Amino acid sequence: MATKKEEVKFEDNLAELENIVRKLESGDVALEDAIAEFQKGMKISETLKKTLNEAEQTLVKIVGKDDNESEFSAEQKEY
């Protein structure tokens, strides 16, 4: 059985991180709350990064099956 943490969708985590960023950018947060929100945001960010890395590896495996395609890396593409 999946834990509650595992059931949170990527999009939900991204939306939560965006809300945290908005709160912190507003400047209307007490220092202690800002630190707590920042820590929460960092944890969410790591989860998102892990999910994206796993998705990238899956795509690399899929694309790698076709001899006409080559492996790619997120570091190679600047956004």
From Swiss-Prot:
Q: Which cell locations does it reside in?
A: Cytoplasm
Which Gene Ontology BP terms does the record give?
DNA catabolic process
A GO molecular function held by the record: exodeoxyribonuclease VII activity
Any Pfam family from its record, for instance, is: Exonuc_VII_S
Listed PANTHER family: EXODEOXYRIBONUCLEASE 7 SMALL SUBUNIT (PTHR34137:SF1)
- Name the family: Belongs to the XseB family.
Question: Could you tell me what this protein is called?
Answer: Exodeoxyribonuclease 7 small subunit
